């Protein structure tokens, strides 16, 4: 799996959060960072969108993280992720910058994902996504990490 995201993680806490889960995942979650755009907001969005699409492998199954994307509870997301991983295509998650994802990125996406209706900092999303991917894989494998729904 691959996370293709706009900008470089400079904050150690954000980087450590991402790495804590990304390194424990199987398949591993690799991070590809593309440059932040410059200029007016529309130009930034366009440039960042082009950079995201350029970093996306040709046959990839692209999942765009977007506030208008599909929201899942943890069990449903585990099922969806297993389906994506079974496609025999590289699964790539796309995270835009502060201006969001450009239209062509959303058009190229095979699916969309929302981590809820709140707006999250795009650097923090990396760690949140890595944790949710780890949780989904734990659910699928029967690992005790996910505790929701267990009897008290």
From Swiss-Prot:
Q: Which residues form a coiled coil?
A: none
Pfam families xrefs: SPOUT_MTase
Question: Which GO cellular component does the record give, naming just one?
Answer: cytoplasm
* Top-tier EC class: transferase
Subunit info?
Homodimer.
Tell me the gene name: rlmH
State the function annotated in the UniProt record: Specifically methylates the pseudouridine at position 1915 (m3Psi1915) in 23S rRNA.
User: PANTHER family per the record?
Assistant: METHYLTRANSFERASE, RIBOSOMAL RNA LARGE SUBUNIT METHYLTRANSFERASE H
Protein EC: 2.1.1.177
UniProt KW Amino-acid biosynthesis keyword = no
- Which top-level group of life is the source organism from? Bacteria
Q: Which Gene3D superfamilies match?
A: 3.40.1280.10
- The protein depicted here goes by the name Ribosomal RNA large subunit methyltransferase H
Its annotated compartments are: Cytoplasm
Residues reported to bind S-adenosyl-L-methionine: 65, 96, 115-120
Keyword vocabulary terms for this entry: Cytoplasm, Methyltransferase, rRNA processing, S-adenosyl-L-methionine, Transferase
| UniProt family annotation | Belongs to the RNA methyltransferase RlmH family.
Gene Ontology MF terms in the entry: rRNA (pseudouridine-N3-)-methyltransferase activity
The reaction(s) this protein catalyses: pseudouridine(1915) in 23S rRNA + S-adenosyl-L-methionine = N(3)-methylpseudouridine(1915) in 23S rRNA + S-adenosyl-L-homocysteine + H(+)
The keyword Transferase appears for this protein: yes
